[in-house]
């Protein structure tokens, strides 16, 4: 249940909208929303001891959302500023996994998964409802280290993002509009460390961004939404999965092609590394819930030994 409270408008001290969300079960906010941020210095997402700050480019305009730590009774207070404040607080229940139903997931036969589910009962898949805000950083993350991608994303947001409305932490930004993204010149993609292949993929998405978002909204199934994404040059299976896991809380899409994921899943489930095909075979018994199983593995605390060559951090600004 969500209670929408009146709030004063036009003040940086007082929110433009606020809500109290009372979930049916206690939600682990960091575990649920942790996948959304792109590194510790993401200009759109910042954590502190009291909760999380998140900026949005909503259909009504920019917004800053503050989600506070749950109260003693499990209720979660959220406040928002900016033209998109009402949209942002309305999105809180879905963002915190209200529609993510784990009741059909049976992991009782695997000790690691069973233990992780027991220790993380408040883990849910977050649904942002903002396709482009998940798709563009996923493209930037293609075939490079996380460090490179996070650095590029932060640079582009600092240069072209809009200052966050309200009392957000210094340096927070709202992602550019579609038109502003389209207007970024090739040399600034380059200066941000995004090589020409990824920059072309981003521009290809931006050409059809409006129709792509509409197609994803109207898709009868999440599989159809993934198919729509993969029609764009430069958007493959990995990128579609990384996007829909965040924008639509896709419970089954697995990031096939990830540099480490298959090895990690294999070692966690059977004690040895596997390739992508092996990972999909291991996850097959949980079809329909495979992303949930991956999230349980990630939340389990399992550590695997990274062997072999590491990806080299490259500075594409000088290529």
State the predicted function of each range.
Residues 1-319:
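HhH-family (HhH-GPD) DNA N-glycosylase catalytic core used in base-excision repair
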């Amino acid at each position: 249940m969500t209670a929408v409270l009146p709030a004063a408008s036009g003040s940086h001290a007082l929110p433009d909208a606020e809500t109290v969300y009372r979930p049916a079960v206690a939600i682990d906010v960091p575990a649920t929303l942790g996948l959304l941020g792109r590194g510790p210095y993401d200009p759109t997402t910042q954590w502190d001891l009291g909760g999380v700050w998140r900026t949005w480019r909503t259909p009504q305009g920019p917004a800053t959302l503050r989600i506070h730590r749950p109260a003693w009774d499990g209720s979660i207070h959220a406040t928002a500023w900016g033209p998109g404040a009402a949209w942002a607080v309305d999105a809180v229940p879905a963002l915190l996994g209200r529609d993510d139903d784990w009741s059909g997931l049976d992991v009782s036969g695997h000790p690691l998964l069973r233990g992780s589910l027991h220790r993380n009962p408040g883990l849910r898949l977050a649904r942002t409802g903002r396709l482009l805000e998940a798709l563009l950083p996923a493209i930037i993350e293609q075939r490079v280290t996380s460090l490179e991608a996070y650095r590029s994303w932060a640079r582009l947001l600092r240069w072209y993002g809009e200052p966050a409305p309200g009392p957000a932490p210094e340096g927070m930004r709202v992602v550019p509009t579609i038109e502003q993204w389209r207007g970024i010149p090739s040399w600034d993609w380059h200066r941000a460390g995004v090589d020409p292949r990824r920059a072309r993929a981003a521009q290809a998405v931006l050409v059809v961004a409006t129709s792509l978002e509409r197609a994803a909204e109207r898709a009868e199934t999440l599989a159809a939404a993934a198919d729509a994404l993969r029609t764009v040059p430069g958007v493959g299976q990995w990128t579609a999965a990384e996007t829909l896991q965040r924008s639509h809380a896709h419970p089954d899409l697995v990031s096939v092609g990830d540099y480490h994921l298959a090895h990690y899943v294999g070692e966690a489930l059977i004690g040895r590394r596997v390739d992508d095909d092996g990972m999909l075979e291991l996850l097959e018994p949980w079809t329909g819930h495979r992303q949930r199983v991956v999230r349980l593995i990630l939340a389990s605390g399992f550590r695997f030994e990274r062997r072999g060559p590491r990806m080299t951090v490259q500075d594409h600004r000088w290529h």
